[in-house]
């Protein structure tokens, strides 16, 4: 069985998807389904869109996950609001269930004695588990089971468990439906057997749930911050008998069971309403959704989910070469370990699966709810590392580096909505608290305007840990780059207030400083006030490379937005003048590296995880080989070399992206493989379920272990795509950093390019053999590879076959 198929990129079923569903069916699913307040039932597909197993991209496993290791071994499902980790044990299916808005904490607007924000679970708050669901099956002990299989079917967006007891074949299918706003678990059997057991629904904050009629369970509660939450479960049985009592739902002699779980909170993304919707009854919503979905045949629930999922997942197809039959015959964890062995053959289909897993997580975690946090949408308990927050100094941004290049631009809207909803609170807190005399990062001019954030943010307008002056510019950059891919003026109009407010902050913050150049001449420059280069070095340095690069980029983006929208021309001219006066990082005469600080003697930690001074290389373009002076480019390369090739997952992903930008394919590829290596014990690397593991003991405390942090699951696939295509508005470069392992032959369709284009291409022996470009909003660009260059002009929707 080719669980990670060699022909994953050539899918005839993808081309027939619209035919199966009917365009009139598919498009309403994308437009309305899964809305948290939707009362109209989702439209249902008229034909099954389920991709057959031989064409689906699957991650197979030969054993169930243990409850104690569910975060490393459990398989994730999600619909953007509800997420679950699924264990797959025959005797007890365990689900750890989360709801994206279930957060403790609040605005956290009182500064500490040092002028910074409290950063504890009690004050800042934390992302929390909603429930644990246990489906216990009598007579299904592991010792009685044969032919056990468990898999994540990424193409169809579901988890399956299969096993045999005697002559009966048991199958489970689990998925989180966006159209039906529900988690669904379907149990089937073939043969003489049936299902007998009980269901427990546990509120992770207040204990067991209670019966809800003959075929349901439910609970409702309220966190200490007043946030109300609820979950409701409904069961439909094929034959047999259902009964409830003592907080349990028992089932007897059922040939099949459909279990539907829904959950909600009264969170509202509106600070003016106190981040609560007083009209919202989480229990009523959960019960109504569960009841509605439970009346729909399980196969139709699955078809509706698959249609919605595939409309996103199928936008990108990738082939990087063929793996061997022996590699295909391994289960996923064995395959990950085999790839890391010495010596080891390339396993390009495994690498494609890892890339597509990042896209699967994007679809599962980022739809119409809050954006992906440090753990995406998945938890094992109510005490996650760093409260599973929104870190603004690389992690939140990295969560979205994969989306637009991989055809999932629609998933970025969760980040846009989050920033827009938080903006009034961020602005108010900035203008009332940033210049507090206790804040060492305050504006020494005494001026204040616009908005910024702290390193950590929560969904209640709250900030945590240190102030992060340049965090506003980096968040704006993420939103601006989404516009670069889509060329959607409506999106640009939405983010314009964020761009302008960030510029206003920096207009008030920048200070004039006399700079002496290498030739002894002096000049006046504008520099960042006292600041901290994430996350090391002096905490009172001026003109840090990190902020200077981000502000230079922000000012350029705002000027373009102003011109495109025809707004605030006079203010844009002011920003242009400021941009021209900005100090930009220089080359240390001692190390030859790009300086992180204005002092040539301060090199900081040579191997530090952050690449803060290289913002102009990635995510920026100022230091790209096409644009940068050779001396600056070499200085950036030397700094990147000094940072090393070993770090945490997200830091290796960032390094890989930078090496791809520099055209060093083999170093970029080596870093991809570093992240793909198996996490043994607590080490950095990939867990059995492909989640990235972060070894906390490397922060100096050997008692700390490995934790899940999701950013590398997006950043590493983003680096893989960056190796295949580089783009900026007006320029698309094919195969800029193609490693030898992928050079023999490959294919990609639907690859996003800045400027408003998508690219399909195939290559052989490292050279493109087929190239097509489609406009999704762009009109002009230059397409190049090797010594070839083509100037392209297209109308929206037009496709040009270049080669």
Where are these regions (language model features)?
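Acidic/histidine-rich catalytic neighborhood
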Residues: 501, 505-561
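Short, glycine/acidic-rich hinge or "gate" loops at secondary-structure transitions
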Residues: 369-377, 494, 511-528, 567-571, ...
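Non-catalytic carbohydrate-binding regions of carbohydrate-active enzymes
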Residues: 478-486, 490-491, 502-512, 572-604, ...
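Aromatic-residue-lined binding/catalytic grooves and analogous aromatic/hydrophobic interfacial grooves
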Residues: 41-463, 481-483, 500, 548, ...
């Amino acid at each position: 069985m080719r669980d990670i198929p060699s022909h994953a990129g050539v899918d005839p079923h993808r081309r027939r998807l619209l035919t199966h569903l009917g365009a009139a069916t598919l498009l309403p699913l994308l437009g309305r389904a899964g809305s948290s307040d939707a009362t109209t039932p989702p439209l249902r597909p008229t034909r099954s869109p389920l991709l057959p197993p031989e064409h689906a991209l699957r991650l197979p496993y030969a054993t169930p996950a243990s409850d104690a290791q569910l975060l490393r071994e459990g398989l994730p499902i999600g619909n953007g609001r509800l997420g679950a980790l699924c264990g797959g044990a025959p005797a007890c299916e365990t689900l750890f269930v989360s709801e994206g808005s279930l957060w403790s904490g609040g605005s956290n607007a009182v500064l500490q004695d040092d002028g910074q924000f409290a950063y504890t679970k009690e004050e800042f708050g934390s992302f929390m588990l909603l429930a644990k669901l246990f489906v216990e099956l009598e007579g299904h002990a592991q010792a009685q089971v044969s032919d056990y299989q468990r898999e994540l079917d990424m193409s169809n967006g579901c988890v399956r468990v299969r096993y045999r007891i005697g002559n009966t074949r048991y199958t489970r299918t689990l998925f989180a439906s966006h159209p039906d706003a529900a988690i669904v678990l379907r149990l089937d059997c073939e043969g003489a057997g049936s299902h007998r057991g009980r269901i427990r629904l546990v509120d992770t904050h207040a204990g067991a749930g209670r019966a809800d009629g003959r075929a349901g369970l439910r609970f409702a509660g309220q966190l200490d911050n007043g946030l109300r939450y609820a979950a409701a479960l409904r069961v439909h049985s094929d034959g047999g008998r259902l009964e409830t009592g003592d907080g349990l739902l028992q089932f007897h002699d059922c040939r099949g069971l459909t279990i539907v779980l829904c959950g909600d909170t009264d969170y509202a993304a509106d600070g003016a309403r106190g981040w609560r919707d007083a009209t919202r009854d989480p229990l009523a919503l959960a019960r109504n959704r569960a009841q509605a979905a439970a009346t729909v045949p399980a196969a139709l629930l699955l078809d509706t989910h698959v249609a919605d999922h595939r409309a996103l997942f199928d936008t990108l197809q990738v082939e990087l070469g063929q793996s061997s039959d022996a590699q295909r015959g391994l289960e996923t964890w064995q395959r990950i370990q085999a790839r890391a062995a010495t010596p080891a053959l390339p396993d390009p289909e495994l690498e494609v699966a890892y890339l597509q897993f990042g896209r699967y997580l994007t679809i599962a975690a980022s739809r119409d709810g809050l954006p992906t946090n440090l753990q995406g949408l998945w938890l094992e308990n109510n005490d996650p590392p760093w409260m599973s927050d929104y870190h603004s100094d690389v992690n939140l941004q990295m969560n979205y580096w994969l989306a637009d290049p991989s055809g999932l631009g629609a998933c970025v809207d969760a980040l846009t909505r989050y920033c827009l909803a938080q903006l009034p609170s961020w602005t108010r807190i900035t203008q009332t608290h940033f210049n507090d005399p206790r804040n060492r990062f305050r504006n020494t001019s005494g001026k204040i305007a616009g908005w910024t954030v702290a390193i950590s943010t929560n969904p209640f307008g709250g900030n945590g840990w240190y102030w992060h002056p340049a965090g506003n510019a980096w968040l704006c950059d993420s939103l601006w780059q989404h516009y670069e891919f889509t060329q959607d003026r409506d999106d640009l109009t939405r983010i314009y207030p964020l761009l302008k407010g960030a510029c206003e902050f920096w207009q008030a913050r920048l200070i004039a400083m006399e700079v002496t150049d290498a030739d002894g001449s002096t000049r006046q420059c504008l520099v960042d006030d006292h600041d901290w280069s994430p996350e090391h070095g002096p905490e009172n340095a001026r003109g840090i490379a990190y902020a200077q690069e981000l502000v230079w980029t922000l000012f350029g983006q705002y000027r373009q937005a102003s011109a495109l929208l025809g707004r605030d021309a006079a203010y844009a001219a002011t920003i242009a003048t400021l941009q021209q006066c900005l100090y930009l990082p220089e080359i240390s005469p001692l190390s030859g590296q790009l300086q992180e600080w204005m002092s040539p003697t301060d090199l900081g930690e040579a191997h530090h995880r952050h690449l803060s001074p290289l913002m102009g290389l990635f995510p920026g373009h100022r230091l790209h080989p096409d644009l940068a002076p050779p001396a600056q480019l070499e200085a950036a390369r030397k700094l990147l070399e000094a940072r090393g090739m070993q770090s945490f997952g997200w830091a290796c992903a960032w390094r890989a992206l930078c090496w791809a930008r520099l055209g060093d394919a083999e170093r970029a590829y080596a870093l991809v493989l570093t992240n793909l290596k198996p996490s043994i014990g607590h080490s950095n690397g990939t867990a059995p379920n492909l989640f990235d593991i972060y070894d906390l003991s490397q922060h100096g405390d050997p008692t700390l272990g490995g934790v899940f942090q999701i950013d590398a699951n997006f950043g590493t696939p983003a680096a893989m795509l960056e190796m295949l295509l580089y783009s900026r508005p007006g320029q698309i470069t094919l195969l800029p950093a193609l490693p030898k392992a992928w050079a023999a032959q490959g294919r990609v369709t639907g690859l996003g390019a800045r400027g408003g284009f998508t690219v399909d291409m195939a290559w052989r022996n490292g050279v493109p053999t087929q190239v097509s470009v489609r406009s999704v909003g762009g009109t002009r660009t230059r397409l190049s590879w090797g010594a070839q260059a083509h100037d392209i002009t297209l109308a929206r929707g037009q496709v040009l076959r270049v080669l």
